Amino acid sequence: MPAIDVGRIAVVIAGRRAGQKVVVVDIIDKNFVLVTGAGLNKVKRRRMNIKHIEPLPQKIDIPRGASDEEVRAALEKAGISLA
């Protein structure tokens, strides 16, 4: 299983956003991360428990705390879709 780090693409596995892909933008502590859908899906930037996401092998190169515009540009450059 890939590690949860900044720029990692993940799938939400719990809650009403289950099945949606997100990007990890920041690591808050050992239990929570900041994720975003970057405006490409219905997931807004929010804190999420790491037990509620499943990391995927894909990763994009973004700085910690990147804006949604920076995330969207990095996703387009890497050719990754969150839809």
From Swiss-Prot:
GO function terms (MF aspect): RNA binding; structural constituent of ribosome
GO BP annotations listed: ribosomal large subunit biogenesis; translation
Annotated Pfam families: KOW
Stored InterPro entries: KOW, Rib_uL2_dom2, Ribosomal_eL14, Ribosomal_eL14_arc, Ribosomal_eL14_KOW, Translation_prot_SH3-like_sf
UniProt keyword terms in alphabetical order: Ribonucleoprotein, Ribosomal protein
Any Gene Ontology CC annotation: cytosolic large ribosomal subunit
Gene3D superfamilies in the cross-refs: 2.30.30.30
Quaternary organization: May be present in 2 copies per 70S ribosome. Part of the 50S ribosomal subunit, where it binds 23S rRNA at its canonical site near helices 25 and 41, as well as a possible second 50S binding site near helix 58.
PANTHER family membership: 60S RIBOSOMAL PROTEIN L14, LARGE RIBOSOMAL SUBUNIT PROTEIN EL14
Family: Belongs to the eukaryotic ribosomal protein eL14 family.
Name of the protein in question: Large ribosomal subunit protein eL14
Organism, scientific name: Pyrococcus furiosus (strain ATCC 43587 / DSM 3638 / JCM 8422 / Vc1)
